[in-house]
Amino acid sequence: MSEAIIAKKAEQVELIAEKMKAAASIVVVDSRGLTVEQDTNLRRSLRESDVEFKVIKNSILIRAAEKAGLEDLKELFVGPSAVAFSNEDVIAPAKVISDFAKDAEALEIKGGSVDGKFTSVEEINALAKLPNKEGMLSMLLSVLQAPVRNVAYAVKAVAEKDEEVA
């Protein structure tokens, strides 16, 4: 192999390793068998959720996983592999890919990583069932507002009772 090719591959490994280190979550899939239309729709859905999706050679993925300290991921890089990276939303790649896989039987989830920890297919599917960040924040806000709302109702009830007595 020429020096230029080796240097280019080393640069790719470095770039992918940095993406792996920075990612909040990574989902590895086998997208073999998807139609062009399905692949385009999947990529569009992932892009709308700020998820980066790439098909990368396994040899580069294996070296990048080693460099990023994610050795457990190496077992997933067998056969055709595509990788979804999300730097912000932990749930987005799992949710988009899991939802898409329900309609596209050819899409197979292999596994992934969440915050640097290996994640099985079952864990990714469970993660996909969780609400997204905005949904979780609204649930938290509802829980935090409930006691204040109850106090307000109690004060209002006492005030109405005092008006009836007066």
UniProtKB/Swiss-Prot annotation:
GO molecular function, one term: large ribosomal subunit rRNA binding
CDD domains linked to this entry: Ribosomal_L10
Pfam families in UniProt: Ribosomal_L10 (PF00466)
Any one GO CC term of the record: large ribosomal subunit
The entry's keywords: Ribonucleoprotein, Ribosomal protein, RNA-binding, rRNA-binding
InterPro entries: Ribosomal_uL10, Ribosomal_uL10-like_sf, Ribosomal_uL10_bac, Ribosomal_uL10_bac_type, Ribosomal_uL10_CS_bac
PANTHER family for this protein: 39S RIBOSOMAL PROTEIN L10, MITOCHONDRIAL
Stated role: Forms part of the ribosomal stalk, playing a central role in the interaction of the ribosome with GTP-bound translation factors.
Subunit structure: Part of the ribosomal stalk of the 50S ribosomal subunit. The N-terminus interacts with L11 and the large rRNA to form the base of the stalk. The C-terminus forms an elongated spine to which L12 dimers bind in a sequential fashion forming a multimeric L10(L12)X complex.
Family according to the record: Belongs to the universal ribosomal protein uL10 family.
Name under which the protein is recorded: Large ribosomal subunit protein uL10
Organism: Streptococcus agalactiae serotype Ia (strain ATCC 27591 / A909 / CDC SS700)
Lineage: Bacteria, Bacillati, Bacillota, Bacilli, Lactobacillales
